[in-house]
Amino acid sequence: MMNYSCAKAVTDERRRTGNKIVLFATLFMLVATNAVYSQGKTPVSWKKVKVLVYTKNGKGYVHANIPSAVKAIQEMGRQKGFSVDVSDTPTVFTQASLSKYNALIFTSTNNDVFDTDEQKVAFMRYIQAGGGFMGIHSITGTERKWEWFKRLVGGTFVRHAKHQKFKQVIVDKQHPATIDLPAQWEVDDECYYMNTINPDLKVVLAHDLRSVNDPEKPMWFGDSYPSAWYHEWDGGKQFVTVLGHDGKMYDDPIFRKHLLGGLQWVLAGNKKLDYSKARAVSPTDPLPY
């Protein structure tokens, strides 16, 4: 039988060992968390940044918000010191042209926005070379039949609730796209839903479905549904927000902070494009996973 002093020694050692394990686990989680956010919080040398805003729409509905979105991004560029080019012409999608940009911003693009497979491949190779990408509002309704693109943006639009005021839930309070948002944020917008979702998305913001008037709202995620997310896929960094239907939103300082934070995450930590890593030869190349 173990005497009291021996038992106490064993208990103390187990406690010390347990504390060490807890401490190690805590430190590991902190390091992992910091690793996730370090790129997003890395200061961006804005004056060295050049972005392309792409606004092409295929046959079908075209959002009236596009001029407002372009104006907002241009004004943010002037405030921060980064350059902004704008195009609705798919011929801009060549390696020579895209290699000038640190990030591409697709704002309220919809349906088919490329004319040729060569343009699609140039876009794929840009992403694979490490190019940044940000999609705004109806981006999930863009290129709905192209599997690679659907995985890039994170999902495929299926429908939205009627335009109304409803609340947003901040899922990740430390991300640059949400860190400056109010704890209670009500938007006057459309609640977008998708019928496919890439499983690797890191959601930062969600629709509060309890505040949405929609008898057909899906309850796959309980009372919330993703509205903004980020991931790193096929060599590049992507940020998407489905908010921004009404052109007036782009004058809202809060929404601008949301957009600028998303762009900051895309740009932070980015290295120069490395086309030696680009491998695409066809839009139907096998997906990374």
Enumerate the language-model features and the residues they cover:
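Glycine- and acidic-residue-enriched helix-capping/strand-helix junction motifs
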Residues: G58-K71
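Bacterial N-terminal signal peptides
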Residues: V22-T33
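Short alpha-beta junction capping motif
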Residues: V51-T55, L98-E143
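Sec/Tat signal peptide C-region and signal peptidase I cleavage site
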Residues: N34-S38
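N-terminal secretory signal peptides that target proteins for export/translocation
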Residues: M1-G18
